[in-house]
Amino acid sequence: MLLKYHAIIVFALISLLSTAQTTRKYSNEFLNIGVDAAALGMSNAVVSHTADVNSGYWNPAGLVNLEDSQLALLHSSYFANIANYNYIAFAKPLDDQSAVALSLIRFGVDDILDTTQLIDDQGNINYDRVSLFSTADYALTFSYARRLPLDGLSYGVNAKVVRRIIGDFASSWGFGLDAGIQFETKNDWKFGIMARDITTTFNAWTFDDDKLADIQNAVEGQNQTVPESTELTIPKLQIGLSKKFVFHYDYSLLTSFDLNMRFAETNDVISTSFASINPALGFEFGYTDLVFLRAGAGNFQNELQLDNSENLTFQPSFGLGFKYRGIAIDYAFTDIGDQSAALYSNVFSLKIDFSIFR
């Protein structure tokens, strides 16, 4: 039985590697922002120890650690509150061996001015012809996790549907799969692997020709090319290691280290033509399982400067958390001091364990 599961995992990884060599397109980058302020406060270095409702995003294998149903909510804003990022998830154990989860992510910009009709047929500017539209990305994910016969080993899979809308101009549907495993040793070391977009998640776009014509004719000589109708998201691999240390019963320190791998050449700190690797390190200090202080560093990049030299940057993060009787409130601030060119934000999240109602 174990040999069968090992064969499935090896086959999935081989498929991931071989497909990555033929895929060059990027899409669905909103799915890389992350969920759960507790995880963001640790620079997303959570793939090995995630064990709650948010595991549906980070590593579905962690869902098997649920003891009761859980609900999670998150909100954050980017670009001076122009873009809003929201997340809701629900997870439920089926029995002591398996669990399921359902989550929804929305990243959108609302009330964008549509000025394609600003100038009427007579060449006059008429502000009454200006309308509003929204652009939004949605991802609905169903997760399933199960323990394997080997003690401490579990696996999980995600099936996700992606919907992207740009007003009445264009829209797309997409579909993809993720898979993850977790393993905990007898001395409490935890290992995790999360393979995202193992089937090269795709988006198939459709366009409103009349609306696009308005854009193409707005400025002569510009905006003349219709974008490609198909986007592919290359596979990504996240490998993690973590351990929790307990001191004098009341104090704990969780340390976690992750390697984030893309099968493309980027400006990550470790980059080759085959793959690029970006490390992340996270810490969580806890007191009586009630108050938590978190810190992390990730997104290490070799940024190109104006003089063509390279400068190593990273994205620090900080977080606070409070948990009382099944209700957890977490806060994270990412990219402290604007150390990198990445997005930064104040992030708040809420997690409710339904055991408080029993």
Model-found features: residue ranges?
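Bacterial N-terminal signal peptides that target proteins for export
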Residues: 1-7
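Generic short N-terminal amphipathic or hydrophobic helices
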Residues: 7-8, 13
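Subset of outer-membrane beta-barrel
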Residues: 21-358
